[in-house]
């Protein structure tokens, strides 16, 4: 775990009440896909845990859904805003324990951490396949991951 100050470089809507936030800062404590960060939000007592979608040494990408006061405040942040994060929390996924053709299955806000996992599996030469089954979708705007996948080189099967 490492505490650090990060700068918002992007905070954009990708689906109904769902945003992708990119933060610049020292992400060296994040070592496995599936880990999470705790975000300190000004004026609120408790930090908010948010899973890491993707990262590298100098950046963290979070995908979050606006469901309460904390995430509502996060959704209003603009590039240049500073956030205090605890990084490298949780055990994450053991990408080395997978077979040659891992199957990644997810839904809702549980899908974003699979992006970082798939990216690392593919970099290791594995043929990761994603399967997303969407239940009770009332509006296309409520589908969380399709926009991010549109620019992704990783194959996915999406069914509604």
Functional labels for PLM-detected ranges:
Residues 2-81:
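Ferredoxin-reductase
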